[in-house]
Amino acid sequence: MKIEIVVIGKLKEYIRPAVKEYIKMLSSFAEIKLTQIKHAKGYKDFDKSLKKEAEGIISQLKESDYVILLDQSGRSCDSISFANHFHQLIQINSSIVFVIGGPFGVDESLKKRANELLSLSDLTFTHQLAVVILLEQLFRAFKIINNQKYHY
């Protein structure tokens, strides 16, 4: 099972240790790849920046990738529901790509390419923190799927 997490921008120093730790913990369940896409800078309007970022992401996706875009308008669920849904997805998809947009959101073309939209919470998080939260939920999901204890 291959899982890729694509995020706009370079991860900040204080986020990297948590990301590294979760990727290490997840390695017994899946191959995790983190891809950081450069912010599209130099554009005076956000729409052009978002379009450029989306083009960069979409160009790296394979047609067979199952793409889940993290977006505030996406479907929300609790950890058990996420684990159950994720379990179904990994049984039929060999490659799942989670996409986390930058601080200004994502272009509509990326939403159209996504197979589904997922909201991590009704709360708003920085895209940097969303990476850590997603990794934690993936780890929790694998523990639930495999009937393993998590932290209790």
UniProtKB/Swiss-Prot annotation:
List of residues binding S-adenosyl-L-methionine: 70, 101, 120-125
This enzyme's EC code(s): 2.1.1.177
CDD domains: RlmH-like
Primary location: cytoplasm
Subcellular location: Cytoplasm
Family: Belongs to the RNA methyltransferase RlmH family.
Name of this chain's protein: Ribosomal RNA large subunit methyltransferase H
Organism field: Pseudothermotoga lettingae (strain ATCC BAA-301 / DSM 14385 / NBRC 107922 / TMO)
Gene from which the chain derives: rlmH
